[in-house]
């Protein structure tokens, strides 16, 4: 029970630190958590927590790249502001490629992955600002491209 309470305290402190939007590296987050009294925290634990809570690196008001948590922790929807992060949607013979604002690709890919094969998406690979999407077996790349354009209400 005590470990559960410690874990909850760690999560609470972690989220509070990320809301400050001033940490540009995992090492800085480790140091801040150690200063908060979590002596056993290390970089790999911070990395797992960043992934678990969907944290991304984005620019803060000072235009510095920092870690932050997404506004919503559920699966994003196309009615959320995420569609505003999509800058370009294009395709070739094999893949659909989406370019996003820096740090937004993984969130957009998560949305697309949640739609799945029924919507024509076999899978996605996301970097910082680029997503590769491969069509499911019964869809052409062009059909997938058109469906994604409709999804994000864009005429690109």
Swiss-Prot record:
Keywords: Amino-acid biosynthesis, Arginine biosynthesis, Cytoplasm, DNA-binding, Repressor, Transcription, Transcription regulation. It is found in: Cytoplasm. It comes from the Bacteria. This is Arginine repressor. One of its GO terms (cellular component) is cytoplasm. The keyword Kinase does not apply. One of its GO terms (molecular function) is DNA binding. Belongs to the ArgR family. InterPro entries: Arg_repress (IPR001669), Arg_repress_C (IPR020899), Arg_repress_C_sf (IPR036251), Arg_repress_DNA-bd (IPR020900), WH-like_DNA-bd_sf (IPR036388), WH_DNA-bd_sf (IPR036390). Regulates arginine biosynthesis genes. Pathway: Amino-acid biosynthesis; L-arginine biosynthesis [regulation]. The keyword Lyase does not apply. One of its GO terms (biological process) is L-arginine biosynthetic process. It holds the Pfam family Arg_repressor_C. Gene3D superfamilies: 3.30.1360.40, Winged helix-like DNA-binding domain superfamily/Winged helix DNA-binding domain (1.10.10.10).
């Amino acid at each position: 029970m005590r470990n559960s309470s410690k874990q909850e305290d760690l999560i609470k402190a972690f989220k509070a630190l990320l809301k400050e939007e001033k940490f540009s590296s995992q090492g800085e987050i480790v140091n801040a958590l150690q200063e908060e009294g979590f002596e056993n925290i290390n970089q790999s634990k911070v990395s797992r927590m960043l992934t678990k809570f969907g944290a991304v690196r984005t620019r803060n008001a000072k235009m510095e790249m920092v870690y932050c948590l997404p506004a919503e922790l559920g699966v994003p929807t196309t009615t959320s502001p995420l569609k505003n992060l999509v800058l370009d949607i294009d395709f070739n013979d094999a893949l659909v490629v989406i370019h996003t604002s820096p740090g937004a690709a993984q969130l957009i890919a998560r949305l697309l992955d949640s739609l799945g094969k029924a919507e024509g998406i076999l899978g996605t690979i996301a970097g910082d600002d680029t997503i590769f999407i491969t069509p499911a077996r019964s869809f052409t790349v062009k059909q997938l491209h058109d469906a994604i354009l409709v999804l994000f209400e864009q005429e690109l």
